[in-house]
C-alpha cells in the first residue's frame, strides 16, 4: 500500500493563481460561452444558482434559465412546496402548454381570479368534465364585474363561448403566430378531433422566446430547472414528486458526496427507469477518489467543493477541505476520461474566478454569494447606513438547520446531523450574514459573462473547450495578489463588476 505523504499535496485556490495571456485572434463578442452542465444538457451560460434558501426559489430559477443558465431549487422546504416551485418554473414559458390550467362553467370568478394570480396568467380555458373545450374566460371578461360580485358570478355568465379560434396539435410556430395575428387573440387552444382540450399556445410565450433567445429550455420549449434532494428520510419521496412535477435535473446535495448514503441513492435513481429523462448530479466532493466514486455510481455530473463558500465554516470547524482550484483539478482527473462534466461550487468572488475554475477542469460554476444580493433571491432588502443589503446564510448555519414547522429541518441531513435530537446540540458549519444589493440577475450575469469573454480574449479561446485546452496558470505570491487588485488609491466610484 502506497504511503500517504501529508506534505506532498499542495492546495491552491483562486487567489493563488492567474491565467497567462497568449496570442489571440478572438474578440470578446465572438466568444462562445456555452458548456455542458451534464452529459445531456448544454447551457449557453456556464452559470448555476446554488441550492440555498437565500439564493434559489422559483423566481431565481426562472431568471437563471431565461438568461442561459440554470437554477437549482433548495430543499430546505416541504416536498409540496419544492414540487410547486418546479411546476411554476415549467409553466412560466412553453412552446405549447401541455397541461394548461383550466376551469369549469360552475366555478366562480373569485376562483378564476385566484387561479390567475397563483399562476400569473391572464385567463383560462373552460372545459367540461370529459375535457371538452366549451369556452375561455380572461381578464377582459371579468374587468367590469364589481369586486363584491366576484364570489356570486359564475364563469358561464361571462365567458366567451364556443366556437373559438382553435388549432390542432402539431401546428408550427409560423402557423400559430398567423392565427394569433389574424384574429387578434392572445391564447390559442389546441384540440383533438373530438374537441377536447390538448394544449394551449399563448402570444406571451413567443414574445419571451424573442426576448430571451439563449434561454435554457427542454424539448417542449419549457424552461429547464434543477432541484436538490438529500439521501435521508423523505429523499426518495421527494425525488419522485420532483420527477412528477417535471424537474430536469436532480442534485443529490450533501457536504460529503463520497458517503455511502449519497452513492446509494445515486445508484437507485440511475437504476429506476422512471428517472431516465432526468439527469442526476452528485456532490459535493473535493478529491479524485470522491469524484470517481460518484462516477462509478452513475452520475451525469460531479459537483466539487468542500468548504470554499464565503458563508461556510467546514474547513475551520472540521478542519476538512481542499482549496478549490486544486479540488476542481483533482476531480477533473477522474471526470474527464469518463466524459462527465464537473461543476465548481463555491468560492467565486469575481468573474475572473470563473475562467480560473474552467481552466482548472470545471465545465460550469455554481454561484451563491454573487447572486444572493439580486432582486430574484428570496428575502427582503435590508437598509443599513444608507446602503442596501440582502440576507445570505449557509445551509450549515444554525438558522438553516434549526427545526421549523413540524419539528423538521430539511437542511440537517446535508451535514449528516439528521439524528441530532435538539437544536442546541447542532454543530453548525456555516454562518448567517448579508451581502450588498446587486440589482437584477440579468445585470449580474451580463457582467460575469462579460468578464469570462474577456478571459477568453486574453487566452485566445473561442469556446470553453478551447479555454480549457489553452489556459495555463501561473502561481502568484501575496504581493502578486495585492498588485492584481486596485492599490495605492482611494476608490470613489464603484465598478459594477468589482467590490472589495
Kindly label every feature range from the protein language model.
Residues 59-62, 237-245, 286-304, 344, ...:
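Catalytic cores of alpha/beta
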Residues 72-76, 102-103, 123-125, 145, ...:
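Catalytic beta/alpha-barrel core
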Amino acid at each position: 500500500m502506497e504511503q500517504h505523504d501529508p506534505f506532498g499535496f499542495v492546495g491552491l485556490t483562486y487567489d493563488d493563481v492567474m491565467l497567462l495571456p497568449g496570442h489571440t485572434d478572438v474578440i470578446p463578442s465572438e466568444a462562445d460561452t456555452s458548456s455542458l452542465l451534464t452529459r445531456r444538457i448544454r447551457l449557453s451560460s456556464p452559470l448555476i444558482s446554488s441550492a440555498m434558501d437565500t439564493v434559489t426559489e422559483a423566481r431565481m430559477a426562472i431568471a437563471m434559465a431565461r438568461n442561459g443558465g440554470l437554477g437549482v431549487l433548495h430543499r430546505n422546504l416541504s416536498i409540496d412546496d419544492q414540487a410547486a416551485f418546479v411546476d411554476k418554473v415549467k409553466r412560466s414559458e412553453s412552446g405549447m402548454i401541455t397541461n394548461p390550467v383550466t376551469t369549469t362553467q360552475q366555478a366562480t370568478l373569485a376562483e378564476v381570479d385566484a387561479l390567475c394570480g397563483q399562476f400569473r396568467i391572464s385567463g383560462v380555458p373552460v372545459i367540461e368534465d370529459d375535457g371538452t373545450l366549451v369556452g375561455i374566460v380572461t381578464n377582459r371578461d371579468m374587468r367590469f364585474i364589481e369586486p363584491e360580485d366576484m364570489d356570486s358570478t359564475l364563469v358561464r355568465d361571462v365567458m366567451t363561448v364556443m366556437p373559438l379560434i382553435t388549432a390542432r396539435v402539431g401546428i408550427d410556430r409560423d402557423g400559430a403566430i398567423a392565427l394569433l395575428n389574424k384574429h387578434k387573440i392572445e391564447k390559442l387552444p389546441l384540440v383533438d378531433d373530438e374537441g377536447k382540450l390538448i394544449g394551449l399556445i399563448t402570444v406571451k410565450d413567443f414574445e419571451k422566446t424573442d426576448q430571451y433567445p439563449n434561454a435554457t429550455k427542454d424539448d417542449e420549449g419549457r424552461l429547464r430547472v434543477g432541484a436538490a434532494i438529500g439521501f435521508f428520510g423523505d429523499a426518495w419521496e421527494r425525488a419522485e414528486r420532483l420527477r412528477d412535477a417535471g424537474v430536469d435535473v436532480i442534485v443529490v446535495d450533501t457536504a460529503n458526496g463520497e458517503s455511502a448514503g449519497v452513492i446509494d441513492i445515486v445508484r437507485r435513481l440511475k437504476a429506476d427507469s422512471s428517472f431516465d429523462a432526468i439527469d442526476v448530479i452528485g456532490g459535493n466532493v473535493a478529491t479524485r477518489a470522491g469524484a470517481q466514486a460518484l462516477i462509478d455510481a452513475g452520475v451525469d455530473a460531479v459537483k466539487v467543493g468542500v468548504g470554499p463558500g464565503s458563508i461556510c465554516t467546514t474547513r475551520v470547524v472540521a478542519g476538512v477541505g481542499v482549496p478549490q482550484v486544486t479540488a476542481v483539478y483533482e476531480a477533473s482527473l477522474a471526470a474527464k476520461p469518463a466524459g462527465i462534466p464537473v461543476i465548481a461550487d463555491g468560492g467565486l468572488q469575481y468573474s475572473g474566478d470563473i475562467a480560473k475554475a474552467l481552466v482548472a477542469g470545471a465545465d460550469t460554476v455554481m454561484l451563491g454569494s454573487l447572486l444572493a444580493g439580486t432582486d430574484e433571491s428570496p428575502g427582503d432588502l435590508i437598509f443599513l447606513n444608507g446602503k442596501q443589503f440582502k440576507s445570505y446564510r449557509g445551509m450549515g448555519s444554525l438558522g438553516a438547520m434549526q427545526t421549523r414547522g413540524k419539528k423538521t429541518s430539511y437542511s440537517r441531513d446535508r451535514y449528516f446531523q439528521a439524528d441530532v435530537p435538539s437544536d442546541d446540540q447542532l454543530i453548525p458549519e456555516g454562518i448567517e450574514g448579508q451581502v450588498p444589493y446587486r440589482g437584477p440577475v440579468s445585470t449580474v450575469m451580463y457582467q460575469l459573462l462579460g468578464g469570462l469573454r474577456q478571459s477568453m480574449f486574453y487566452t485566445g479561446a473561442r469556446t470553453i473547450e478551447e479555454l480549457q485546452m489553452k489556459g495555463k496558470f501561473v502561481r502568484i505570491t501575496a504581493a502578486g495578489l495585492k498588485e492584481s487588485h486596485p492599490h495605492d488609491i482611494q476608490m470613489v466610484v464603484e465598478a459594477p463588476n468589482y467590490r472589495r
